[in-house]
């Protein structure tokens, strides 16, 4: 796996999010704010999760063929969940330019339910699928 490739993309996404936080005062009351820039970040971040999950799937012993029937969530992330308990991993938002006070917004488990599909999946996945498949309807 080319770790530098993923790391560089991650750092770029992080920089863009921090730049956005200079424009939008991100606090507990602003989490419903929507913009095309946020949609773009959601799509690009989700694509990176898809890509790295598939690469890790094969590195960690996944056996399904790499074709249209290999799903990043129910196949790749499910295998990684069984090995690493990804759903229990916590990310803490600690940037001083995010004005979050509620613990539910500071301590995140972004991969909780990420190995599921549809209405059972993670909120970010539902948003990603909605924006990816019907952007015009999803932003109204």
Residue spans for each PLM region:
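Charge-enriched, short contiguous segments at helix-coil
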Residues: 131-140
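Amphipathic alpha-helical interface elements that mediate macromolecular binding in regulatory proteins
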Residues: 43-46, 126
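Short non-catalytic regulatory patches outside canonical folded cores
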Residues: 50-126, 133-134
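Charged alpha-helical initiation segments
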Residues: 1-44, 51, 55
């Amino acid at each position: 796996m080319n770790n530098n490739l993923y790391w560089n993309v991650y750092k770029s996404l992080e920089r863009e999010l921090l730049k956005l936080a200079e424009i939008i005062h991100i606090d507990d009351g602003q989490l419903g704010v929507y913009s095309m820039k946020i949609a773009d970040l959601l799509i690009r971040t989700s694509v990176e999760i898809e890509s790295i999950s598939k690469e890790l799937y094969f590195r960690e012993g996944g056996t399904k063929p790499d074709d249209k029937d290999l799903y990043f969530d129910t196949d790749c992330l499910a295998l990684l969940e069984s090995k690493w308990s990804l759903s229990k991993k916590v990310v803490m938002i600690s940037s001083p330019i995010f004005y979050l006070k509620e613990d539910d917004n500071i301590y995140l488990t972004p991969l909780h339910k990420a190995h599921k599909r549809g209405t059972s999946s993670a909120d970010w996945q539902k948003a990603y699928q909605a924006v990816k498949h019907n952007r015009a309807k999803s932003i109204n």
